[in-house]
Regions:
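Positively charged, low-complexity terminal tracts
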Residues: 1-150
Length: 150
């Protein structure tokens, strides 16, 4: 039987495998993605993979990401960022990958980059990237894994 420590290790492993951390701040209406340059490239890869998957062509198709599956990419009629994820046509997801790649190319660790307006003007939420140093451990950003409880 697995206990809390096993669950924490599984969650930690899933974050590291994903390559980037995300969280949604309700009070500020902001998705924040934290990752190294490599992790940001992984995010771009996931966006491109979503765009290329023929199963995602239909409106309302979606994929969940991360150990908690909070972030989702959703095929929709227009690009937008809202509290439950990133929406758009499949070509919008490919375009978002290019926007992120271009923004990260000139960024330095510690830079915080707002992406939502470049992606979609009709967004209800913000999308920000925080470029972390190369030694950043994705799971270290998860407050549930860092708590002293359990």
């Amino acid at each position: 039987m697995s206990g809390p420590k096993d669950l924490k290790e599984l969650t930690r492993s899933e974050w590291e495998s994903l390559g980037f951390f995300y969280d949604y701040d309700d009070s500020g209406g902001t998705w924040l993605v934290r990752a190294t340059r490599f992790g940001m490239e992984r995010l771009c890869d996931e966006l491109r993979r979503y765009a290329l998957d023929p199963r995602n062509m239909e409106i309302a198709e979606h994929q969940h990401y991360g150990p908690y599956s909070y972030l989702k990419f959703v095929t929709w009629t227009e690009p937008k960022v809202i509290a439950d994820g990133i929406y758009g046509r499949v070509d919008d997801f490919a375009r978002l990958a290019e926007i992120i790649a271009a923004a990260i190319a000139s960024a330095k660790p510690g830079d915080r980059i707002r992406i939502d307006e470049a992606y979609a003007m009709a967004s209800e939420a913000k999308l920000e990237l925080l470029l972390e140093p190369d030694n950043f451990k994705v799971a270290s950003a998860d407050p549930d894994l860092c708590s002293k409880r359990n």
